[in-house]
Amino acid sequence: WPSVHLLPADWFYLALTAHGFDVLLVWIIFFEMAVLYFASAVILGSRLAAPKVAWGGFWLMLLGAGMTNVAVLQGDSTVMFTSYVPMRASPFFYLGIILFAVGALLGVCCFFGTLVVAKAEKTYEGSIPLVTFGALTAAIIAVFTIACGAIILIPTLLWSIGLISYIDPIMYKIIWW
């Protein structure tokens, strides 16, 4: 509301960017990783296939989230959650999102591996439980989502560094959404 002026415009977009990233990406995906681990290791009564990979993914997600938040809070990456080109953010903004996504991908791979371990060790009989099936569906969707994000965020990172001179904003919007 322009007449209310709760925040100045620059602080509004800073808060909106941080809120969008933290609530729509960080919180939801950390929760999804927890669901994947629960649906595989706990519900199936199996061990995690690669605990070190799972912890590595967690720390990468945490590092990426922290890096992106610092870039936003420094004030040079208030591009809102969608971060549309041609609005340029700090390279650390894009690098943080990429690291976060790689960490999530490691978590998804650990989930798939845990399903294989559970099947090999016969920790369950018949088909997988419904909750685990739902988590499997979410994990498959996550792989495709992360791949689409990489397709557009890696060139955007290179553009923000200056290694690529132009990114088509329409292509960015189509791939992002």
Name each region found by the language model.
Residues W1-W177:
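Membrane-embedded and interfacial regions of multi-pass energy-transducing membrane proteins
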